[in-house]
Amino acid sequence: DLDTVEPMIALPYHPSNAFPLREVIAEPEKYAKWVEEQAVKIFENTPDIHPNLEEKIVPYTDAAHALSDAFPIDRRIRVDQAAIAGCAAGSFENIYAVEQVAHESKKALGQFAFNVYPASQPIMVELNRIGAMNELMIHGVRVKTAFCGPCFGASDCPENNAFSIRHSTRNFPNREGSKPGQGQVASAALMD
């Protein structure tokens, strides 16, 4: 029964750092601190690396309060980049589901770098034929050609100290393209 499956997020810097997404949303400070503690251990021999996920925690403003004083009702981890890519994650079903969320929300999804890579050209053609690609682009999502790059850090490399969420098939240290030996690191979390 798929209704019993809980959405998870694999936090930086290892795929085993998986937690229920609802917990991370409910307690962002706790999990940001935990990620930073892991980074201290992982990058202990790289003194120039200072990831700061706690600075990504910002007030969240509900749309219902947007016309008032932008009343903060909660705090969330600000996402700098998102990508849906790869042979498994770029499926017709996944991208169509994102289009449905965009259509129902009536909000821009591309307020940060959000890239979608269909798994194949035939998938892209079909999503385009039914109007899903146009809907995503109207909502600010950048639609790119089928490409394996985001899965192994060959494209969509986040900026230094950025927080990136990704729905892709691979997860290993520095998989998003970070170069800790050169003083650059980003925090990538996988979502399924």
Annotated model-derived regions:
Residues D1-M191:
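Fe-S-dependent hydro-lyases/dehydratases of central metabolism
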